[in-house]
């Protein structure tokens, strides 16, 4: 069986597992995305994962697994905070072209690369933002305007909640993709989540078939407005998390 058929089948099964349609257009966008990631990665650090099958499993399918949380299959307005190489935001957009998706990253070079990738894979309705999450969360255009915020960023959950929850409208969700050992991190972050207007709803384990990768979806519901003093000045949430 050739690699093209293998990759199509892997992606198709992942889509079926989250009840989303998969087709040739989506497949071709994923393959173009993979190739462009590899081309750009020598110039701008986007990913430590460079093998084709690993990119598909550990970036694309891992991102698609976020749709195991059913709310994200229907949410209209979604922002990906600290998107890096475009994960999970671009795979989400490929799978849900109807969604209004925004990508934010603090590194201008990465945003320029993502603009190039999006253009070349035929997606022209994603907003990309270069800047600090703490600064744009104060902007009325973005503050509490999103049905969902997603992030695969490496910050601890208390800090990440301060970056992300201010963007979520009341009744919406913040979904963090975290590693396998998340219970202690969640316990430490509960104070921050509460202060910022959130409530932990669920921790959902995610496994990638035929892979050593394990993740947890930490699902936090926004139940009240974030106090206006949050997020604090850039860098504060990292240095002095609300714990």
UniProtKB/Swiss-Prot annotation:
Q: Which domain of life is it from?
A: Bacteria
InterPro entries cross-referenced by the UniProt entry: rRNA_ssu_MeTfrase_G, SAM-dependent_MTases_sf
Subcellular location field: Cytoplasm
Stated EC number for the protein is 2.1.1.-
Give the Gene Ontology MF terms in alphabetical order: rRNA (guanine-N7-)-methyltransferase activity
Q: List the CDD domains.
A: AdoMet_MTases
| Chain positions recorded as S-adenosyl-L-methionine binding sites | 82, 87, 133-134, 152
Keyword field: Cytoplasm, Methyltransferase, rRNA processing, S-adenosyl-L-methionine, Transferase
UniProt-listed Pfam families: GidB (PF02527)
Which GO CC annotations does the UniProt entry carry?
A: cytosol
* Class in the EC hierarchy, top level: transferase
Family annotation (SUPFAM superfamilies): S-adenosyl-L-methionine-dependent methyltransferases
**Residue ranges of coiled coil:** none
Q: Which family does it belong to?
A: Belongs to the methyltransferase superfamily. RNA methyltransferase RsmG family.
Q: What does this protein do?
A: Specifically methylates the N7 position of a guanine in 16S rRNA.
Name the chain's protein: Ribosomal RNA small subunit methyltransferase G
Q: Which organism encodes this protein?
A: Clostridium novyi (strain NT)
């Amino acid at each position: 069986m050739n690699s093209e058929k293998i990759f199509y089948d892997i992606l198709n099964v992942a889509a079926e597992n989250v009840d989303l349609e998969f087709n040739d257009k989506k497949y071709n966008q994923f393959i173009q995305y993979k190739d462009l990631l590899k081309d750009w990665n020598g110039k701008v650090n986007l990913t430590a994962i460079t093998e084709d099958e690993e990119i598909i499993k550990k970036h694309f399918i891992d991102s698609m697994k976020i749709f195991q949380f059913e709310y994200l299959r229907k949410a209209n307005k979604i922002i990906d905070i600290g998107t890096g190489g475009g994960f999970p935001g671009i795979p989400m957009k490929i799978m849900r072209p109807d969604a209004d998706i925004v990508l934010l990253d603090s590194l201008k070079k990465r945003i320029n690369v993502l603009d190039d990738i999006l253009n070349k894979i035929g997606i022209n309705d994603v907003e990309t933002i270069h800047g600090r999450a703490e600064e744009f969360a104060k902007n009325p255009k973005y503050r509490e305007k999103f049905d969902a915020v997603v992030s695969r960023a490496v910050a601890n959950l208390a800090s990440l909640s301060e970056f992300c929850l201010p963007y979520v409208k009341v009744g919406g969700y913040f979904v963090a993709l975290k590693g396998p050992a998340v219970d202690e991190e969640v316990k430490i972050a509960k104070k921050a989540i509460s202060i910022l207007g959130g409530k932990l709803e669920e921790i959902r384990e995610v496994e990638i078939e035929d892979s050593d990768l394990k993740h947890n979806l930490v699902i936090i519901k926004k139940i009240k407005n974030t106090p206006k003093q949050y997020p604090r000045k850039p860098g504060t949430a990292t240095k002095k998390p609300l714990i």
